[in-house]
Design a protein with these regions (language model features):
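Post-DEXD/H (motif II) to motif III coupling segment of the RecA-like Helicase ATP-binding lobe
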Residues: 138-200
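Conserved RecA-like P-loop NTPase helicase motor core
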Residues: 283-290, 294-371
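Conserved interdomain linker/interface between the two RecA-like ATPase lobes of SF2 helicase motors
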Residues: 179-257
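Conserved helix/coil segment N-terminal to the catalytic DExD/H
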Residues: 97-131, 142-147
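Conserved helicase ATPase core of P-loop NTP-dependent helicases/translocases
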Residues: 79, 94-104, 120, 265-269, ...
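Walker A/P-loop
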Residues: 30-52, 257, 281
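Conserved pre-motif I regulatory segment
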Residues: 1-37
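Conserved Walker A/P-loop ATP-binding site and its immediately adjacent core
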Residues: 45-47, 63-87, 144, 261-262
């Protein structure tokens, strides 16, 4: 395929998507494997589906056959990809779990966990995929993805992610030869393509911040969940989490990120005891129950979803107007993915409130800080991008605004009374 001559259908794409797609085709003329970085909520799935549509149409025009595989690691992502392919009228099959397979279809949507099982391995190898697209590609250094890439050395590959960053600072260059970066989050906010936000956090010298800083680190490189549970899943700290919600986000619909199932259940119970329609959800929540809870949330019948590692990727609900961070992490990728759930735009939403009860700002800066993604892509150590000064009140929190003044102080700091803030 001569990518320089490919006919692109850019109807319904925004300028940044059109530019990114052109850069992908140009990069494929020089490299076999490229990665695209684009912030959460700016249309990655729609973009690569448009690219798939271009490929399918151009191959048909030239009377050639084509096989495309789109890979993800979660059911929610696979369903989202399938729905977008259907919007484009692209016939596709599934390679996932017990789903019925239609391997004769030229586009396949596959779970990385299912593709290389003994049941599917032979059929996958027979497909001879010409293109492989990986969603949430910051996971693709895992052995399963490496094995998949090695099965199809001649295929063109595209990995898409908001965060080309690994907790161990591993380089992506072993899989991807080139990184295409999109504008920064601040650019999308200024263009009205992502939501403006206020950010509330604890002071760097607060007791909670000291507890976070002194928490045990697990072999994964992130904080130990057991230690976090022992330290932060206490009534007085949970009470401060609720008080901050009541002060800054009461009546809003949003998502809370908790440490583990017990922490999530305790927080949901606390919020419910104050009359807030809150439920806990985690990976062990039955699929049917999870679907019903998410539907109720999207329809507005549930105000607060307290989750454990569920709504970090592939969850699309633009009406979310507050995000509450109650789970410490050392992962920049997790931080950006979590706050990104609240930055989608929808009519009537002026700003998102981000309540940071565990001081992630003090590790990573604001969500829209300028990130040197090429630096992280190559595997260099972290740089905290705090390119704006901070203003604190005399108590324990600050509120950051995305506007010309950039920050404002908050004089009322009742939620920081006592030793924990």
């Amino acid at each position: 395929m001569d990518f320089a001559k490919i006919v692109q259908d850019n109807i319904n794409l925004r300028p940044h998507q059109i530019e990114a797609k052109a850069e992908i085709f140009d990069a494929w003329s020089k490299y076999d494997s490229v990665m695209l970085q684009m912030p959460t909520g700016t249309g990655k799935t729609y973009l690569f589906t448009s690219l798939i549509n271009d490929l399918v149409c151009n191959y048909k025009r030239e009377h050639k056959e084509i096989n495309i595989l789109v890979v993800a690691h979660r059911t929610e992502l696979l369903d989202q990809i399938s729905a977008t392919l259907s919007r484009f009228g692209i016939a596709h099959g599934f390679i996932q779990g017990a789903r019925e397979q239609h391997l004769w279809k030229r586009v396949q949507v596959g779970s990385i966990m299912s593709l290389l099982t003994e049941k599917n391995y032979y059929n996958v190898c027979r497909q001879r995929f010409d293109y492989i697209i990986v969603d949430e590609a910051h996971h693709s250094l895992a052995d399963t993805y490496v094995k998949l890439f090695n099965l199809f050395p001649e295929a063109k590959k595209l990995g898409v992610t908001a965060t080309p960053w690994r907790l161990n600072h591993e380089s992506f260059l072993s899989l991807y030869q080139h990184l295409i970066t999109s504008p920064q989050i601040s650019w999308f906010i200024n263009k009205g393509l992502l939501s403006d936000f206020d950010y509330v956090s604890i002071k760097p010298n607060s007791e909670v911040q000291r507890l976070v800083n002194n928490s045990e680190v697990a072999s994964t490189g992130d904080f130990s969940n057991t230690d976090l549970d022992n330290t932060f899943n206490k009534q007085r700290i949970r009470a401060k989490v609720y008080e901050s919600y009541e002060k800054f986000a009461k009546g809003r619909q949003g998502i809370i990120y908790a440490i583990n199932k017990r922490h999530a259940a305790n927080l949901a119970e606390l919020y419910s005891s104050h009359g807030v329609d809150a439920v806990a959800i985690d990976c062990d929540t039955p699929k049917e129950v999870r679907h019903d809870l998410i539907s109720s949330f999207k329809e507005g019948r549930i105000k607060v979803l307290v989750n454990v590692d569920i709504f970090t990727e592939g969850f699309d609900c633009p009406s979310v107007s507050f995000i509450q961070l109650a789970r410490p992490t050392k992962s920049l990728a997790l931080y950006i993915q979590q706050v990104g759930r609240g930055l989608r735009v929808v009519e009537g939403k002026e700003k998102t409130i981000i309540i940071d009860n565990v001081g992630l700002y003090n590790y990573f800066g604001l969500p829209d800080a300028n990130r040197m993604w090429m630096y992280h892509f190559k595997g260099h150590e972290d740089v905290v991008h705090k390119d704006n000064s901070r203003l604190f009140s005399n108590e324990c929190e600050f509120v950051a605004e995305v506007d010309e003044s950039r920050f404002r102080e908050n004089d009322d700091s009742s939620w920081c009374s006592g030793n924990i803030c």
